[in-house]
Amino acid sequence: MFEIELKAHVRNRENLIAELKTFATYEKTVERNDFYYGKEIESENSTLKNISVRLRKESKKTEQGTEIKNIFTYKQKEIKQTASKIETELNDEKECTVSDFAPIEEFLKDSGFILTLHKKKSVEGYILNTGFGTANIEVCNVPPLGDFIEIEILSKTKDEKTVKNIQNELVKILQRCKIPESDIESKYYSEMLREAQEVALR
């Protein structure tokens, strides 16, 4: 499955949540603790590229109770523009749950991967039925970056027509949240966190 996702800054979290409750359904509260491991490898054309994997410790609270998971993820990312130049993410994500991260961490270190980033994210999640499947809407706090909204729809394909239709749907949902398109953020969290670290070290 391919994730098609839009991310935007949230200037007023309380107003956003009040707006979401008028058209979307609350699903969960989640705490995510992410550890990114990266390695530089030689690609087919002999250029160097970075590959990374994520180890996520997730605690999810729903009406049924609390669920704790360890999730191993490999994700290939792209940035796609809409006709109006709005940028969204297109991600090919592969993941599985594991009982213990210790063996994976040892394997990664022995294979030359290094810990490149640690990210924490607190999430309040909502769902909305659309003509393109369920939209997952998450109101996120990512220290020290602040609050964001992420809107995601999964697709079995990534052909141009499907991607454009879903991109347009994501923008419509953002408009229903009364968040301006000027607040859309095309940078990855990892990029913003590294920039924040550099500023803090100056």
Question: What kind of feature is each model-predicted range?
Answer:
Residues 1-132, 188-202:
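N-terminal strand-loop-strand beta-hairpin
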Residues 15, 62-64, 148, 158-161:
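Intrinsically disordered, low-complexity acidic/polar segments
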